[in-house]
From Swiss-Prot:
This is Phosphoglycerate kinase. Monomer. Keywords: ATP-binding, Cytoplasm, Glycolysis, Kinase, Nucleotide-binding, Transferase. InterPro entries: Phosphoglycerate_kinase, Phosphoglycerate_kinase_CS, Phosphoglycerate_kinase_N, Phosphoglycerate_kinase_sf. The gene is pgk. It comes from Aeromonas hydrophila subsp. hydrophila (strain ATCC 7966 / DSM 30187 / BCRC 13018 / CCUG 14551 / JCM 1027 / KCTC 2358 / NCIMB 9240 / NCTC 8049). One of its GO terms (cellular component) is cytosol. PROSITE patterns: PGLYCERATE_KINASE (PS00111). GO terms for molecular function: ADP binding; ATP binding; phosphoglycerate kinase activity.
Length: 387
């Protein structure tokens, strides 16, 4: 992937606009989870060290376009940045006609979704963003799959458009896992439905040496192998699709499962062979034999891509399968990349964040890359790099 990188540019005295992903949860005017801001801090610090006249913008929540709404203001993010950077940070509300920034100063441009034309990516708005800067830096991988004014349009018209360190790192890690994987490559895909992950499964079936399926997705494959899945979440209309994927790909067969009578935190868990599942059972996790077999596969891998838990890990009695998988990934010397909201929650629960080679910041963008789709905000950077 050939893009201009911010790290290679001289930013001294230049007006630099960074599109970051600062879409963080806020409660009572305070940031409640700072992961995305923390991920962006090295980019901000580097630009300031390089002497840039620095502006940064992001969306936050889903406000009505064209209307200011304090609930979705970036003010709490500004307060957080002041503390984190130990320097003054200004919030600019009306900035589309220009904003004064000194070298080494940071100005946060208010929620870009307050601007009319942001989501539709109107040329008028894109040109206004572009006029604010000498260098545009796209550093929000989480929104790279959306062609919006602040992610795509501005990159068309800015004098220079480049990738920030976070975006460049994300593309490098995904490229390493998907485009040039060291083999054997194992992909783990969990989640509740085959239908929502079908393109991911089809794409990975062409790349992975072994494709591990978990969660509700696995139930459809268990049914496709001719077993009873009782009252479990299962897409019976996709059994033929599962059979086709199983025939074309090396998908390890689940041999035992953990079942319960109902979806509840207090329902007792019972380990059963897949052959013994009854009409009243609901499958909520893989059993210990299956988990051990998958852990062995993971330990022999050279590349691991993980998207989605293999059981209802939020309930402790159905968490063991995902825990075993997580610990195997943590112990494996392979290059590992993980992405998707539930996956990140599982990584947090089992405390393995520092043992995964790369944790992707993008949910939808991560999946679209894995599906082999073009990410518009990356495509425009590649186009500009060629020009």
């Amino acid at each position: 992937m050939s893009v201009i990188k911010m790290t290679d540019l001289d930013l001294a005295g230049k007006r630099v606009l960074i599109r970051a992903d600062l879409n963080v949860p806020v409660k009572d005017g305070k940031v409640t989870s700072d992961a995305r801001i923390v991920a962006t801090l090295p980019t901000i610090k580097l630009a300031l060290e390089k002497g840039a006249k620095l502006m940064i913008t992001s969306h936050l929540g889903r406000p009505t376009e064209g209307e200011y709404n304090e609930e979705f203001s970036l003010a709490p993010v500004v307060n957080y940045l002041k503390d984190a950077l130990s320097c003054p940070v200004r919030l600019a509300k009306d900035y589309l006609d220009g904003v004064e920034v000194a070298a080494g100063e940071l100005v946060v441009l208010e929620n870009c979704r307050f601007n009319k034309g942001e989501k539709k990516n109107t040329e008028e708005l894109a040109k206004k963003y572009a006029a604010l800067c000498d260098v545009f830096v796209m550093d929000a991988f989480g929104t790279a799959h959306r062609a919006e004014g602040s992610t795509y349009g501005v990159a068309q018209f800015a004098p220079v458009a480049c990738a920030g360190p976070l975006l460049a790192g994300e593309l490098e890690a995904l490229g390493k896992a998907m485009l040039k994987p060291e083999r054997p490559m194992v992909a783990i895909v969990g989640g509740s439905k085959v239908s929502t992950k079908l393109t991911v499964l089809e794409s990975l079936s062409k790349i992975a040496d072994q494709l591990v399926v978990g969660g509700g997705i696995a139930n459809t494959f268990i049914a496709a192998a001719g077993h009873n899945v009782g009252k479990s979440l299962c897409e019976h209309d996709l059994i033929d699709t599962a059979k086709k994927l199983a025939a074309e790909t090396n998908i390890p067969v689940t041999t035992d499962v953990v079942v319960g009578a109902e979806f509840s935190e207090s329902t007792p868990a019972t380990i059963k062979s897949v052959a013994d599942v009854t009409d009243g059972d609901m499958i909520f996790d893989i059993g210990p034999d299956s988990a051990k077999a998958l852990a062995d596969i993971i330990m022999n891998a050279k590349t691991i891509l993980w998207n989605g838990p293999v059981g209802v890990f939020e309930f402790d009695q159905f968490a063991e399968g995902t825990k075993v998988i997580a610990e195997a990934i943590a112990a494996s010397p392979a290059f590992s990349i993980a992405g998707g909201g539930d996956t990140l929650a599982a990584i947090d629960k089992f405390g393995i964040a520092d043992k995964v080679s790369y944790i992707s910041t993008g949910g939808g963008a991560f999946l679209e890359f894995v599906e082999g789709k073009v990410l518009p905000a990356v495509a425009i950077l590649e186009q500009r790099a060629k020009a």
